[in-house]
Amino acid sequence: MNRASPAVKTESNPLSTDELRKIDAYWRAANYLSVGQIYLLDNPLLKEPLTVTHIKPRLLGHWGTCPGLSFIYAHLNRIIKKFDLDMFYVCGPGHGGPAMVANTWLEGSYSEFYPRISRDATGMKRLFRQFSFPGGIPSHVAPETAGSINEGGELGYSLSHAFGAAFDNPDLIVACVVGDGEAETGPLAASWHSNKFLNPARDGAVLPILHLNGYKIANPTILARISHEELESLFAGYGYQPYFVEGSDPGPMHQSMAAVLDTAIESIRRIQREARSRGVNSGERQEAVTYPRWPLIILRSPKGWTGPEEVDGKKLEDYWRSHQVPLAELGSKPDHLKQLEDWMRSYKPEELFDENGCLMPELAALAPEGDRRMGANPHANGGLLLKELEMPDFRSYAVDVPVPGTEVREATRETGKFLRDIMKLNLDSSNFRVMGPDETSSNRLDALFDVTARAWVAQQLPEDEHLSPDGRVMEILSEHICQGWLEGYLLTGRHGLFSCYEAFIHIVDSMFNQHAKWLKVSKEIPWRRPIASLNYLLTSHVWRQDHNGFSHQDPGFIDLVVNKKASIIRVYLPPDANTLLYITDKCLRSRNFINVIVAGKQPALQWLDMDAAIRHGSAGIGIWGWASNDQEDEPDVVMACAGDIPTLETLAAVDLLRRHVPELRIRVVNIVDLMTLQPRSEHPDGLSDWDFDTLFTTNKPIIFAYHGYPWLIHRLTYRRTNHPNLHVRGYKEEGTTTTPFDMTVLNDLDRFHLVMDVADRVPKLSSKGAYLKQLMRDKLIDHKRYIRQYGEDMPEIRDWHWPSPGS
């Protein structure tokens, strides 16, 4: 284990002898606490020889990254105090949880959130015991960790979170530690390009710190095994100014880190000062690249630094074996127990903590105070800073629907006008952004460009449109980065919306999972304040991807979403423009949810006027009386639909049934809020059994046309009384490049198949049903012949509309 003698302050050594002694002691204290959390149940100050009874029965956690994380934390504390910075720490190597907990305990913020974990020997014992222990805290930098917005259990998102946090926070610096293992992930690799979207005149700064300790779980890391020149060129090519801090001797490393951080902060301030005095690009188009070279620090230090050099004759420090728990089997290997005690005593806890277990006052004075402490920074508990969006009245954007099924509109285009004016009303507040992977115009939201542009700080050409350093629409062709930016933006107290093609939102399936888990836990932590919901607007959906083909056809994101906690997720399938307006308003006003809205962008028939849309959207489910004819009697069949195209095909099927079997009593039920189908005991939006039975009856056939995979509806309704009579049509992985209507035919969701389903399941149709089915089969044959001859749908399909009253 390396120990440095104090260095003399020179021009290249910014720390005085006393400053170096103190900062090294502070680092040793954090390392001691990190080891204690992994191993100890008792004897926190080692006031007696270590025995097996002091050791946890199950040793969990990760040591390897902790000393580097704590080294960084101690030095960030120094520059926060020196420059009076508003800064917090995003920890990419989330398995370094012990380090982040240790440092927030040392600075005092942890004990303010958890008074039982006091800043003394009793609190230290509890701190150690709770780590990775039943009833305690997780091993990663979870929501329970003060100052965290990035758990880091699943790697790759730290840097996009950091940039999301920095947008529109001009006085904030986000120090983002990126693990060299994490740097190999796709999302992190793309995140380096975020510097082309950060406007130094308006936004805060991100200080990336690449933690190059050389190893993952059992392999070397790529960036640690390329040459210094290649590594420097890589990050210079990304547009950063890299600074290196390299070594293993703590004394010189402290001096080097202090000097580099001083330079980095001065560079950030110079970049911002120049941009804020003259603007970025001066608002003019430039053919030269003009974004600044932000500083980036590459910290090359040993994995498991200051830990045992060897265990059982095998290398440990500066090798992958230090990744997790360096010393195991302490009960059966006394030499391991002795090695652990020697390791912990090497930090000289008697120099760090007084008799009562309190951090020595001269060391405690190194930490910032109040909200300047990174564990107490309000940006890391964004609900503290959350302000309501200024919202126009969505009813002002209503589509006029004098009668159902005759007017044609593009639902997302109408919502784009609403989003445009939300953006306009909140320009001064700078707290609303729209994210998308190069799809804002494609998804018909381009009204936004009436009031803002795409954020862009890189090169501009004369022919470019809607690019500006001041833009508030964020577009990069990486769903991962869009989601990461938005999460960072929301977690620090702002609002936003993510618009994406339905099939390709699957790219962020696991990011959705992680954010849902974060929200679930955050809701259970009293000091975590509610944040704005994460809102997805999924369009260009499965039923209108006939032109792009099978690869673009997948509605399965909904299935993933409904697996998560009912307290977190909401799924909406508005059938038309007015309902979409209502749902969008509702979602943007909500807190601590993940809202998924699936809506069409193509021209489509409109069903509800605004008053009806509000009533229907508010209930989430309801009978469409104007499309039903069972008002005077029990229905013979319930025709249910969820989604814009299933609604269209259901109503077209109802029209056919009413023309060919007018005596049939039909009830049409439309579902906007998918979770109403679950029992109320399972989801707060769910219908009671009584209400569900009232809508769907207890014994009549239900023909359900659903936007996505049909088995999901069976999952949601399996406990309902009438589930045995439920027949669901939806997407069943049939698709290609074809016509819009043929997509529904390939999946048996079209009007003709729905009519045949009714004929098969309503006993009173008897022989008439056979003739009806034959007629529908003939129509399907006509359809196939027509599209293969003409390349488009039949006129009776293209031109169909809901019959006017009396027709």
From Swiss-Prot:
Cofactor(s) listed in the protein's UniProt record: thiamine diphosphate
Protein origin, superkingdom: Bacteria
Keywords on record: Lyase, Thiamine pyrophosphate
PROSITE patterns xrefs: PHOSPHOKETOLASE_1, PHOSPHOKETOLASE_2
GO BP: any one term: carbohydrate metabolic process
Record carries keyword Zinc-finger: no
Alphabetized GO MF terms: aldehyde-lyase activity
A Pfam family assignment: XFP_N
UniProt entry tagged with the keyword Lyase: yes
Enzyme Commission number(s): 4.1.2.-
NCBIfam families: PRK05261.1-1 (NF003616), PRK05261.1-2 (NF003617), PRK05261.1-4 (NF003619), PRK05261.1-6 (NF003621)
Family: Belongs to the XFP family.
Protein name: Probable phosphoketolase
